[in-house]
Design a protein with these regions (language model features):
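Sec-dependent signal peptide recognition
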Residues: 1-7
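Edge beta-strands of extracellular beta-sandwich domains
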Residues: 95-101, 289-297
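Compositionally biased low-complexity segments at domain edges in trafficked proteins
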Residues: 110-178, 192-215, 305-358
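Long, low-hydrophobicity ectodomains and other hydrophilic envelope-associated domains
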Residues: 187-275
Length: 358
């Protein structure tokens, strides 16, 4: 009798374990595939996409910025485990191919965890990642990110190989364009794909291979917002980085570094993060009028400023000071650390009044 009871218990335990494993295997996450490339270096997927399960990345030519979502078709509920892609790099005028596993465990972890965003009331709300992005940079560099509302997180960096593809017979009129030299050159001269400003900036310059790996280096720094004339910082700002990542102050992992004890300025603890590419924030003047400031850094300048300050010690701490002038019309930016201050002067900025008031 005892032996029979033991057999029954073992069978029940095994059934529970199998059910648990099946539930784990059947976990579904809704997401969309998309791809990107650096501005000025458009690519087009010739064939393939995310693998196991397959999700195509054949969406036309990329025109967006590094790390940003692009075109997308379809939706999946299963975690991809690899990349099998052949793409045309127009700036290099060559094909690349990649066939590799990607960090599916990290993808699953990020899907399971999601991220917390603080609402206007201060309440933490759960948010989900909704896109998996594949980025293709010069030299066959491939980076994968996951993105949700106001949050982009890198999954991993991978490497493709340059290949040669001969034009196969029987292609339709569109497919033949991949092998048309005049068409490929025209893509690089198309201002809707490569803005004239970028065409002129890149003219007669070599392709900066390795640059997008350098953008992945993270430094210990923090943004500091200085609002003058009794103004007050609004609890609303976001940062995009050269490595394609994005954070928002409402992101709880970032909000935990913020101290609101100061009545007029937000104090933030330093954290390891890449060089910024954009910063947007808002504030109130002493009468309660709200202002918004958006800064787009010159990639070359901001990258050089950070590498200069950190060249002797990548572990030192620095602060990026954003100081609003007395009339709330302009923002000066400096990187400060190690007894040095380096002004950042080539950024584009827009400061304007908001309809919102205190």
């Amino acid at each position: 009798m005892k032996y029979l009871l033991y057999i029954i218990l073992i069978a029940q335990f095994g059934a529970c374990q199998n059910k648990k494993q099946n539930n784990m295997q059947e976990t579904k996450f809704n997401w969309k595939p998309t791809f990107t490339s650096p501005k000025g270096y458009p690519v087009e997927v010739y064939s393939g996409g995310f693998a196991d399960p397959y999700q195509s990345l054949h969406f036309g030519i990329s025109t967006g910025s590094w790390g940003e979502t692009g075109g997308s078709k379809g939706e999946s509920t299963k975690i991809p485990r690899g990349l099998e892609v052949t793409w045309l790099a127009y700036a290099e005028d060559c094909f690349y191919r990649i066939n590799c596993d990607i960090d599916s465990k990290k993808i699953e972890q990020l899907f399971n965890e999601g991220f917390k965003m603080r609402g206007a009331s201060g309440k933490l709300n759960h948010e989900d990642y909704y896109y998996i992005i594949a980025g293709f940079a010069p030299g066959g560099v491939v980076v994968v990110w996951m993105a949700g509302a106001g949050k982009t997180t890198e999954v991993g960096r991978y490497q493709g190989k340059k290949i040669e593809i001969k034009e196969p017979p029987g292609l339709d009129s569109h497919e033949r364009l991949y092998f048309d030299e005049i068409y490929r050159k025209g893509v690089m001269e198309n201002e809707k794909i490569v803005p004239l400003e970028i065409q002129e900036a890149n003219k007669n310059k070599p392709i900066p291979f390795g640059l997008w790996d350098s953008y992945r280096i993270k430094y210990l720094w923090k943004p500091t917002f200085v609002i003058q004339n009794e103004g007050k910082m609004n609890e609303d700002f976001g940062i995009n980085f050269l490595n394609g990542e994005e954070i928002n102050f409402r992101d709880n992992s970032f909000a935990e570094r913020i101290d609101y004890k100061d009545d007029y300025n937000v104090k933030i603890e330093a954290g390891k993060q890449a060089v910024p590419s954009k910063i947007g924030f808002s504030w109130y003047d002493k009468l309660g009028q709200m202002y918004v400031g958006n800064i787009i850094f010159n990639d070359d300048e901001i990258f050089e400023v950070f590498t200069t300050l950190y060249k002797d010690n990548e572990d030192r701490e620095a602060e990026l000071e954003l100081k609003v002038n007395m009339t709330n019309s302009f923002i000066t930016v400096k990187l400060k650390g190690n007894g040095k201050e380096i002004a950042i002067t080539k950024s584009k900025q827009k400061v304007f009044e908001s309809r919102k008031k205190w």
